[in-house]
Amino acid sequence: TLANMKSAISRLEGQGLSLLKAVNLRASHFYVKFKPADSAQYEQLQTDKRMTIYPYPLDYEIAVRGNRYHDPSLPKGTITYHYAAVKSDYVFDPKIPYEVLSALYIPEEDTSLKSKTSEAYVDQLLNQAYKQTGNFQDTIVAIKANSPQASYHPGGKIQVWDTRLQQYIGLEGVDMRARRWFTTHHARTDFWGNYQMEDTFKNPCNYSLWFSQEDFVVREHLIALTAWIDGPKQKANWNVDISTGYDRFISHVFRGAYRYHYGFIDGLKRPYLPVARLKYIA
């Protein structure tokens, strides 16, 4: 939060590190809970390119991985709350209910802190902020004053089992996400299922796979929300072989839709694209 970052900056100032001043710090983002009333509002949030929304809170560590979450305070069959970090100048749609949970300062996204010295300072700032909130698993073992921590590009390979070919094939076109707290990086898988984020992280990230594209989305038949597969929190690549079950079924529904929209269909007419994305229910 902004308050935690101000406190961390003040601690660093006490150690003689004063690249930023707590008194001058302003919110760069807001952490928001959206409360979509219907599927139209949910789809509007899903396709808003100014943010990345999730159907679960972002300010908690995920204790148990799973592909489903519904806020226990809401009745079954309703759309669960969704969460996102939006920039401080974000203009909200007054028709969609929302609640600002906290003001944020995300130093990794501060373009004024891009020099080598600034990066090392950001490492120390984040280290202090994590310690203050008890997130010791995210602290860095040792930080040198003018030497930033090494970064990495999240990536990996996604494959699905093809029963006709009797082998794994690449799952092309899915939205791969790598998230650290309130920051998300995206990449698309290629024909072979490979993906790599252009942006970097320095600590482990939460991976996830989302069955969505610009022109269509695969929704789950029971809850009608975008289908997704939750991944691990790690610093290494996330490689997945989807072999059986519902995830394999959804993957092949996505493959069929992807080919219908963008691949070779031997003269067939492409699907009609209305204003909204097409929804395929799996």
List each language-model region with its residue ranges.
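Short, ordered, surface-exposed loop/turn motifs in non-cytosolic proteins
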Residues: 12, 153-182
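A short, solvent-exposed loop/turn motif at the edges and junctions
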Residues: 208-228
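A short, Gly/Thr-enriched small/hydrophobic beta-strand-prone motif that recurs across taxa
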Residues: 134-165, 252-265
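Short, acidic Ser/Thr/Gly-rich low-complexity loop/linker segments typical of extracellular
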Residues: 180-194
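Long, solvent-exposed N-terminal ectodomains/accessory regions
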Residues: 1-117
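Zn2+-dependent metallopeptidase catalytic core
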Residues: 196-200, 210-217, 241-277
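Long amphipathic alpha-helical scaffold segments
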Residues: 89-153
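Catalytic zinc-binding patch centered on the HExxH motif and its immediate surroundings
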Residues: 187, 280-282
